[in-house]
Amino acid sequence: KLKLENFLIKNKKKISCIILRYFNVAGVDKKLRCGFYTKKGSNLILNLCFALKKKNIFTVNGNDYETRDGTPIRDYIHVQDLAEIHLLAAKKILKKNFFKIFNCGYGHGYSVMEILKKFNFYSNSKIRYVIGKRRKNDIVISIADPKKIIQFLKWRPKHQNLEHVVKSSLKWYLKHI
């Protein structure tokens, strides 16, 4: 991703494009037709679903970060909002040639423990967890600044409610994993 982005930046006078930098994509489409799936990775929401479905113990990687509850904070953008951003960007670039880079997120975040608690609440279950070591080079807080994308594309977030993200993820993932 970085190599391609650097190539585009280097050639921005010759290429018309919009670069969309995703933050943490979450949720599934409203008709529950598709969702993100991988057997291995660092996707918190998917890993919580695995822990819930398989009754595994979930590892919280560190609780001594300089955050409100000691766990890392991330900006989660719902996949439906991200799809709308893509449509708006495509319409815009068809009308005029330019080069823009946008952060795709909401401008606020949730900690690992906040997400875990929401999963426990909405699943009516209790994901067992242990506190593990910090991940090497983990970013403490990663939150997008969406001002440019809101202004330029006239985008308005519609699905930034954490309840919607968690409930839709639970419905889809627990059926498909």
Features from the language model and the residues they span:
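Flexible, glycine-rich beta-alpha linker
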Residues: 15-43, 66-71
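Active-site Tyr-X1-5-Lys
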Residues: 1-28, 46-55
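Short-chain dehydrogenase/reductase
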Residues: 1-2, 34-46, 75-76, 109
